[in-house]
């Protein structure tokens, strides 16, 4: 959907929602807050594999942040699993990105509420990622190491359990099956 049409759609939807909430005697101020918060939601999706250069640049940008004492990184890599005698050559990731970005945002905000974090970046691939390439990059920073270790583990588990991202495992012969997270 072109950007202008998308904005008109969301504006129309927001007006409809506010009128519906008024009719139901629901405080629509909370609705305004929701739509304001929505503007803070970042797009975490990167087309294709996440490159080592992208990861290195992200790390390098934090050298000047001297209040940070610890960083921890998770890199999810596509495995060349052997399934029923066939080797996975790639995974094609798809998602309803708006819903997935909202879920990533909720996970991120919950981690900031639970742990003493300074910074967090999450990136996930969309489209085709070949075996051996990076598909998930989570970068967590804090004044102290204990928080980054605990927070990173928590965030990665929440991503795997909650975010609606679908992976089509493509085999070397171009046949495929839909991935099941374990």
How should these model regions be labeled?
Residues 23-35:
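Short, Lys/Arg-enriched N-terminal segments with co-localized hydrophobic residues
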Residues 139-141:
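Short hydrophobic/aromatic beta-strand micro-patches
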Residues 1-3:
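Methionine residue identity
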Residues 11-20, 26:
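Short hydrophobic alpha-helical segments enriched in small aliphatic residues
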Residues 17-21, 31, 82, 174:
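Amphipathic alpha-helical interaction segments
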Residues 6-7:
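Basic polycationic patches enriched in arginine
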